[in-house]
């Protein structure tokens, strides 16, 4: 019994302040996504397969903040766990807003150093859908952690 209770107790203490609420895409979030150009008919994933998370994270000053992100339902529990682990070690996140807040512009979201996931778009330099279009890729602090092309090029000067 002690073997079971001790890990549960330690996990509970470690994540006592961490919160992450998961929900389906509500009509309000759907409206934001459509008006913000991050989802439209023809995207490879229907809205019913996406989940909205409100996640507590730490900023670069160590303050607790609430952010939001959308991911595929198949990875939502893993994403919640990973962000819990990041919270526990004090890993800072500049901001976490939906790409819709940047009119679906990956460029603008990155320039704002915004941590984001779902965005229905083509992969950089490709005609194929990006992993972000499936809600299965996350950019965390993209200025500090930039996308680097195969040739070693970084597109954002602040990176």
Question: Would you name each region that the model predicts?
Answer:
Residues 101-128:
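Conserved short secondary-structure elements within globular domains
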């Amino acid at each position: 019994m002690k073997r079971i209770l001790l890990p549960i107790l330690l996990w509970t203490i470690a994540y006592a302040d961490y919160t992450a609420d998961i929900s389906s895409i509500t009509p309000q979030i759907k409206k934001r996504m459509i008006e913000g150009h991050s989802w439209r008919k023809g995207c490879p994933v229907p809205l019913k397969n996406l989940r909205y998370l409100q996640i507590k994270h730490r900023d670069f000053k160590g303050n607790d903040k609430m952010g939001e992100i959308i991911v595929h339902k198949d990875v939502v529990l893993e994403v919640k766990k990973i962000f819990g682990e990041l919270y526990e070690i004090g890993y800072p996140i500049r901001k976490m807003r939906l790409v819709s807040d940047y009119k679906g512009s990956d460029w603008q979201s990155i320039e704002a150093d915004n941590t984001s996931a779902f965005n229905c778009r083509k992969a950089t330099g490709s005609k194929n859908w990006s992993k972000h279009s499936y809600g299965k890729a996350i950019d965390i602090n993209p200025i500090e952690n930039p996308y680097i092309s195969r040739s070693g090029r970084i597109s954002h000067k602040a990176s």
